[in-house]
């Protein structure tokens, strides 16, 4: 008996499938639509591929998770209950890769470091 192929995205019985956002499809927490809007409003390029906002949202989510993980570990080690801007600044400057990435970034409420 031949198998019937289901159409991609259909939920059967001729009905439409549930719509699924690009953020959900990519399994991200950061909104792909928000990233795309920021890219378009910033006029960074004349054209924008469909995958560029997805990729950038994934990179931003990864960097945020990494910084928060390091700051959370540092907060636990120092006996603090909250992640403060000072902890974020310290974590970014103590990590070699993050330090080179954010070397020109100023974190609000933190005095500039003396190098």
Curated annotation (Swiss-Prot):
GO terms for cellular component: euchromatin; nucleosome; nucleus. It comes from the Eukaryota. Its main location: nucleus. One of its GO terms (biological process) is nucleosome assembly. CDD domains: HFD_H2A (cd00074). It is found in: Nucleus; Chromosome. GO terms for molecular function: DNA binding; protein heterodimerization activity; structural constituent of chromatin. Disulfide bonds: none annotated. The docking domain is responsible for the weaker heterodimerization with H2B. Belongs to the histone H2A family. The nucleosome is a histone octamer containing two molecules each of H2A, H2B, H3 and H4 assembled in one H3-H4 heterotetramer and two H2A-H2B heterodimers. May be incorporated into a proportion of nucleosomes, replacing one or more H2A molecules. This is Histone H2A-Bbd type 2/3. It comes from Homo sapiens (Human).
């Amino acid at each position: 008996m031949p198998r019937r192929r289901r159409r991609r995205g259909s939920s059967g019985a001729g009905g439409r499938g549930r719509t699924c956002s690009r953020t959900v499809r990519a399994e991200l927490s950061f909104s792909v639509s928000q990233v795309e809007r920021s890219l378009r409003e910033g006029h960074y390029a004349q054209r924008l591929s469909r995958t560029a906002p997805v990729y950038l949202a994934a990179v931003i989510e990864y960097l945020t998770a990494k910084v928060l993980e390091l700051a959370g570990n540092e907060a636990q080690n120092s006996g603090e209950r909250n992640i403060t801007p000072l902890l974020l600044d310290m974590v970014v400057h103590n990590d070699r890769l993050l330090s080179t990435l954010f070397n020109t970034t100023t974190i609000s409420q933190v005095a500039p470091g003396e190098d």
